């Protein structure tokens, strides 16, 4: 048993030294390590919770507004709505049967629900971004300003998401014009997704961050979201279709929650990559038994994480992390 432990530790040490010397491996491992330090899974779950409750009210508002804007074009309305539902491949096929109907009452209720859940989602996203970037609580907006700001950001992001949905809808509606039309609309929609992520990474952080430092993560998030949509379509066709016959609405709810949760995970991982790259928080120490000395990146990352807990202007949190065995 002792010999096996020694061999295991030796392998771990060799792997740790290898990833420190090779950035192509050390960087993604450092992103994953910091994501775990920041409890990214819990942050994603919180954002997904509010996002889940905002989806259906927003869809009600969307269908109602379409009814007012295009009163004499029911076929065009249906095509745009179906395209919007296509943004959620896990549930879109379940909702395209005409279960969403718009009315004045639906608009009022949908707006109320969307505002409540949407503000909660924005606040949760702001908290996540500030935690990733290590913004202390004492430097964040106060209770009232945070909610007013969240309301304004909700309209900005909602408008951008609506524009992306309309562009996707134009690709479906104009499919008879040829493949060029569809490719152009999808490309524009993807470009708008990139812009939306880029904007979100900047304005959701209560700290001055260079736009150029956020570009790489925004690109990764945009392509990751597109890949998630493709995988969602595959999942619907091979797994959820048969599960829906057995579990009905329960499968629909689980599918939607899973899709939102994974989408938020992708977004936060992309944002975390921006933080690690900008502050050069790699390589990290990855010895399983934590016997390897901490690196400078370990000290910087753990210090940033600890400073987040400063909640008063006269409070200072000091972090001590020995590096290379020295105090």
Where are these regions (language model features)?
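Membrane-embedded alpha-helices and immediately adjacent juxtamembrane helical segments
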Residues: 1-327
